[in-house]
């Protein structure tokens, strides 16, 4: 297989880059792009490569074509689709860069063979995602076979629930799943799609397309018992007491709003999604850890939370839950809160790596063509 020449859009702290590494494919990241200064600082610290801070919208068709990339990986801004956000979809200016990339895709002379996209669950919300509609319109127009997924790290053995939308697309060729192959990769017949107006907020033309909750042929972890306890993700260079002192939840916060926290014990086998507001806001931003299991809280008494020794996950511990390799480090120039913000905007490396394996795997026809080339080369 040819080397992947990758453009990594919205690169953040390099989740897609690490996904490429873990997948085992031969690749080169030609250029990464992000407007976040701290993300680019850490990307440079990690990979010793500079990300472009130039806005994606300012790149012309000719400039993007000049990279000669055959793979585009991207995790566009999720705020227009988040559960706690305004959900303005394509009316949110933060979608402009993504729409620009889709426009470039229709004009570029040599479009990328492979595309992988990650976003929040709400990106494909039924009846109200014009952005998703435009994505699928573009993929169909440009002759891509594609498959959408809703996947969570827990399915891959990680003690974390973070349901996300993924889409993989391959141009001029079918995707190759290990099993159930005949059930997927179907060409989308636009005449069979529901063409109801988006304005009725009831059904979009793509609502009937199946979004898979698994990767066909992948041996998923189906129960919590198959996941490690969250204590296995703890930083090992500090004792439990030291971790508590370094990341403890302030007592005044526990006394005022303590019962809003999602509390997990050290032997729990799951944790809730960490957002970029972790460590700053409380409800819906991620789990905290009970370091002393000898006490139980009284839901009517916030003072009962104090003996539990409640602390936040460290930034490094969260990256382990996100499937980042142990070699990953944060720049010492970043504060803990800045690290939390970067992690909350990141993605799960393990899931990306498994989807990349499917994306680049040759289908039966491509394997036969490759074998024929090898035979001709031996003559």
Curated annotation (Swiss-Prot):
Residues 178-205 are annotated as: Disordered. Residues 178-192 have a biased composition (Basic and acidic residues). Pfam families: DNA_methylase. Disruption phenotype: Mutants exhibit altered gene expression, and after undergoing 16 development cycles some mutant cells displayed reduced growth on axenic medium. DIRS-1 expression was unaffected but Skipper expression was increased in mutant cells after 16 cycles of development. Mutants lacking dmaA exhibit culmination defects including fragmented, transluscent sori, and fewer spores than wild type. It is found in: Nucleus. It catalyses: a 2'-deoxycytidine in DNA + S-adenosyl-L-methionine = a 5-methyl-2'-deoxycytidine in DNA + S-adenosyl-L-homocysteine + H(+). The active site is at residue 78. Residues 4-366 form the SAM-dependent MTase C5-type domain. GO terms for molecular function: DNA (cytosine-5-)-methyltransferase activity; DNA binding; tRNA (cytidine) methyltransferase activity; tRNA (cytidine-5-)-methyltransferase activity. InterPro entries: C5-MTase, C5_MeTfrase, SAM-dependent_MTases_sf. Its EC number is 2.1.1.37. Its main location: nucleus. Keywords: Chromatin regulator, DNA-binding, Methyltransferase, Nucleus, S-adenosyl-L-methionine, Transcription, Transcription regulation, Transferase. Residues 193-203 have a biased composition (Low complexity). One of its GO terms (cellular component) is nucleus. The keyword 4Fe-4S does not apply. One of its GO terms (biological process) is epigenetic regulation of gene expression. PANTHER family: TRNA (CYTOSINE(38)-C(5))-METHYLTRANSFERASE (PTHR46098:SF1). Involved in epigenetic gene silencing. Methylates specific cytosine residues in the retrotransposons DIRS-1 and Skipper. Belongs to the class I-like SAM-binding methyltransferase superfamily. C5-methyltransferase family. This is DNA (cytosine-5)-methyltransferase.
